[in-house]
Amino acid sequence: IAAVICCATFPMWNAYPAIFANLATGNSAIVKPHPNGILPVAIAIRTMRKVLSDNGYAPNVLIMTADTRGDPVTIELLQHPEIPIIDYTGSQRFGIWIEENCAQKLVYTETAGCNGVIIESTENIDGLINALANGLCGFSAQMCTSPQNIHIPEHGFETNVGQISFDGFKDLLVDAINERVADPKRAAALCGAIQADESLAILDQLRNEDKASIALESFPYDHPEFPFARTASPLVLTVKPELRELYNKEHFAPVAFLIREKNPESALANATSLVRESGAISSYLYSSNKAFTEKAKDAFADAGA
């Protein structure tokens, strides 16, 4: 029997492959949704149980168990002696707990990391800015692949339109984000909503940090379909590289750090060091320099990105 633990933001994103892999190999599965995401999981499980039944299989090879924040059952489920397989998607903190306390079982975890972007040079500055703006806005940066830390040389970088300064890059990025969130209808389609009050609390904490400068303030927008939804546009902060305590972990909120690095080599060293310390599910590089690109690919691979 496998336990499949779902996350709050994308309840079935990783659950589907885990469920199908277990059923295909003859394992039953108990699916445990996050308390904030019970309904979509229940709908999916009901549908899959019907498909099993319609095709002559016992539907109880797939069941769901739900809980609440006040009365959780996850740890009890994971530690049950008849659960030898665990598939978990969620916070890094609880993922580490599972890896340390359920090491005798077959454990798969997909948690989070410090996803970094290094900018060394580009032959398409418009494409770079648009891609970053979309990534920072998309799903309000609540995806495990969302970029967070953007490492930029303090003296700027070469582009197809000439040298662009650190501040020039910052202004281009801020303008692109503002363009995407100015219209609530477009903002809602791209950013969606904030799934938990904790994310709004993170924004409040970071915007009040004395050591960071606000390049772009975050604000709520009126969701055209869900008037009571939590919403927030991206918060963009500029920081010095030595202030690692501000950006050396995943902040589960729409926030990005523009890190003023000494040069591309320092940016690469800092970004890969963060991968070693905090992990990274996605790492990004913009460079038209083939030698630097190869160096960065090797460095990220060695760091475990």
Regions from the PLM with identified roles:
Residues 18-21, 102-104, 134-135, 272-276, ...:
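Short, solvent-exposed amphipathic alpha-helical segments in soluble enzyme
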Residues 16, 47-56, 93-241:
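ALDH superfamily catalytic-core signature
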Residues 55-57, 153, 168, 224-305:
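Conserved C-terminal structural/oligomerization subdomain of aldehyde/semialdehyde dehydrogenase
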Residues 1-129:
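Rossmann-like NAD(P) dinucleotide-binding subdomain of oxidoreductase/dehydrogenase enzymes
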Residues 3-4, 30, 64, 87-88, ...:
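Structured core elements
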Residues 27, 60, 105-106, 212, ...:
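A structural micro-motif
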Residues 59, 80, 111-113, 144, ...:
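Short glycine-enriched loop/turn motifs at secondary-structure junctions
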Residues 36-37, 64-69, 148-157, 187-195, ...:
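Conserved short loop/turn motifs at secondary-structure junctions
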